[in-house]
């Protein structure tokens, strides 16, 4: 991907269990060589020793640690998350499992505003974005970016084995990106 497009950001998303199997310094060295820009460990609280080690290793290598801020995040914790985040804040639009609920436009806008009151770090909104229309509504919240994940994963799962999956998936992605121009 990096050789194809030097401008697109590459974010690796995973779970803390992976870091128990892979020495953190080696992990960061390897992902830097591979061209990654940032890491998001979705289930690691910032108080966790391993996340602190990861954050330091990423910072030492000029890479970003992306943190989640959910609607249930209290003000003190939000401020702590902002202090240790780099790259952008991943603003979670809905409580619960990604891909299940739809985002509420007013709630998203209010949460984006509350984050932007206390930081200049970009805010990217994700969770609950099931359609291009949802993406457009979220984009209008004042966020700096829209993250679509589960919808694309579901599309691929539902169409595995279909002829021309790559082309049809490209059209699916384009339907989202066109409304965001």
Residue ranges, per PLM feature:
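Active-site beta->alpha loop and helix N-cap motifs at the rims of alpha/beta catalytic domains
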Residues: 1-44, 171-174, 178-180
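Histidine/lysine/aspartate-rich catalytic loop segments that bind and position anionic ligands
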Residues: 60-99
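Catalytic cores of alpha/beta
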Residues: 73-84, 125, 129-146
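Structural preference for beta-strand elements that scaffold enzyme active sites
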Residues: 9-13, 37-38, 64-66, 87-89, ...
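Active-site-adjacent beta->alpha loops and helix N-cap segments on the catalytic face
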Residues: 1, 19-25, 43-60, 74-79, ...
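Acidic (Asp/Glu)-rich catalytic clusters
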Residues: 2-6, 32, 55-56, 82-85, ...
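Glycine-rich phosphate-binding active-site loops on the catalytic face of alpha/beta enzymes
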Residues: 37-48, 90-99, 128, 141-161
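Alpha-helix-loop-beta-strand connector modules within alpha/beta enzyme cores
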Residues: 1-11, 56-70, 104-123, 131, ...
């Amino acid at each position: 991907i990096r050789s194809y497009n030097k401008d697109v950001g590459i974010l690796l998303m995973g779970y803390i269990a992976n870091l128990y199997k892979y020495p953190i310094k080696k992990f960061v060295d390897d992902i830097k060589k591979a061209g990654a820009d940032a890491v998001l460990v979705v289930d690691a609280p910032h108080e966790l020793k391993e996340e602190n080690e990861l954050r330091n290793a990423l910072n030492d290598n000029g890479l970003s640690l992306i943190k989640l801020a959910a609607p249930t995040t209290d003000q003190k914790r939000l401020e702590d998350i902002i202090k240790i985040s780099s790259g952008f804040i991943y603003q979670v639009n809905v409580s619960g499992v990604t891909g299940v609920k739809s985002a509420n436009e007013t709630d998203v806008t209010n949460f984006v505003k509350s984050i932007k009151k206390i930081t200049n770090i970009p805010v990217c909104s994700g969770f609950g974005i099931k359609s291009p229309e949802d993406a457009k509504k979220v984009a209008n919240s004042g966020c700096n970016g829209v993250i679509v994940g589960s919808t694309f994963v579901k599309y691929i799962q539902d169409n595995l084995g279909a002829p021309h999956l790559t082309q049809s998936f490209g059209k699916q992605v384009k339907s989202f990106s066109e409304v965001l121009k």
